[in-house]
Amino acid sequence: MATYSVHLASPAEYKEAIALRIHVFVEIQKFPLDEEIDSYDPLAQHFVITHAERANKVVGTLRVYTVGDEAKIGRVAVLPEYQGQGLGKRLVEHLEMHLQQDAAFRQCKEAKLGSQYDKRVFYEKCGFVARGDIYDELGCPHIYMYKAINHIE
């Protein structure tokens, strides 16, 4: 059975995470490179899931930062060859535990993300609920999804 670890990215893992995002969002999904790396990256906490049997290769990533009383989740990506194994869900669940416990997110009442519309079922399986209308982001339909953060005192 494969061994995976979910954790905050080290500086080296952050570089791998950026390369993974470019592969998934730019090379595969054809989003513009100049939109992928943005002004939120330096503000965000970046999480990765690594595969121990592959020299701790980064196989998935996401980022989170605060906007008012929301934890904004974004850039959720898993390498195609690792999709369908529950790794994205593990990444999101780990982030949820982090949001419940980290003082930096204490003011956040809920987590918010902009899901590609055709990926919304994944987030529904993670407990997120769609709110609002479908909107266009870079030519791709998206919808905002939310989940309450139950802080651990």
Regions found by a protein language model. Give the residues of each.
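Short amphipathic alpha-helix that is part of the acyltransferase structural core
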Residues: M1-E35, D41-H46, T50-K57
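A short beta-turn/loop motif at secondary-structure boundaries
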Residues: I37-P42, G114, D136-E137
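Conserved beta-strand in the GNAT
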Residues: V48, N56-Y65, E70-A77
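Conserved beta-strand segments that form the floor/walls of ligand-binding pockets within enzyme
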Residues: R63, K72, A77, G86, ...
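A conserved beta-turn-beta hairpin within the catalytic core of GNAT-like acetyltransferases
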Residues: T66-G74, Q83, F105-Q107, L138-P141
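Conserved acetyl-CoA pyrophosphate-binding loop and the N-cap/start of the following alpha-helix
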Residues: Y82, G86-L95
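Conserved GNAT acetyl-CoA-binding A-motif
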Residues: V92, L99-Q116
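Conserved catalytic-core motifs of GNAT/GCN5-like acyltransferases
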Residues: K112, E124, V129-Y144
